[in-house]
Amino acid sequence: IVNTIIALSLPAGSVSAISLAFTWMLMPQVAIAQSVAVAAMPTFSAQAALGKLDELRTSLAGSLRGVLLLALPATLGLVLLRTPLIRLLYEGGSFTAQSTQMVAWALLWYALGLVGHSLLEVIVRAFYALHDTRTPVMVGVLAMSLNVAFSFVFARLFSVWGWMPHGGLALANTLATLLEMSILILLLRRRLGGLGGTSVPRALLQGGLGTLAMALVLLSWLALTAAQGEALRLVGGAVLGVAIYAAVMLALRVPEIRSVLLALRARFEKKPVH
C-alpha cells in the first residue's frame, strides 16, 4: 500500500509495474512459506504450551531450514527468468516492451526480499505460539516506518542514478522486510536460548552453494538461447535450474531434498486400486 501511494507520483506505469511485480514475488512466498508455516503452527503451539522449548527450537529450525532451501532457488529463478516470464505472459497490445521492462525491473528488487518475506511467515508464528503478538506488531510498525523512509530515499536516488525510480520502492520494501526478519529472529533466538545450533546456517550454506551452481547454468542457458523464443528460454531455464539445484542438494546429502524425492517416488510407484 505504501509503495503504491508513493508510486502515484512517479512516471506513468509505475503503479501497475510494482503491483504486478509484487504479486509475482508473493506467489512463491505463499506456496513455500505459508504452507510450511501453517503446517508447523500446531506443533509450535503444542510444544510451547507444554514448555518443551528444546523441541520447539528443533521444530523451528527444521521449518526455517525447509523455507531457506526452497526460497533461495526461487529467488534466483525470479531474478534471472523475470524478463522471459513477463514478456511471455503479458507482452502484447497495450502491454508494451517498455511495460515488460518496468515490471521486470521492479520484480528484480522485490525478488531479493523473497527469503526475508518467507522466513517471516515462520518466525511470526513462533511468536504467536509463545502467546506473544505484541513483539511482531511492534517490529512490524518499525519496519513499515522504515519502508516509507526508504521508499522516498531510494526513489530519489534511483532517479539521480538514471534508473527507473519505481525500482527504489521495491528495494525499500526488501530492505525493510530483511531488517524486520533479522530483528525478530534475534529476539526469538534470545527468548528460546538458541535456534537449533548450526542447522540453519548450514542450510543457508548448502542452499547458497546449490543456488550458485544453478546461477552458473541459468546464465549460460540464457546466453545460449538469446535468439530463441521466450517459452523455450523460460521453461528450459526452469527445468535446468530445478535439476541442477536438486543434484547439488543430493550431492551435499541434504536430508530435506532426499525426503521430498522419496515421497515423490513413493507416490509415482503407488499402484492404483482396482
Question: What name fits each language-model region?
Answer:
Residues 1-274:
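Membrane-embedded alpha-helical bundles of multi-pass transporters/translocases
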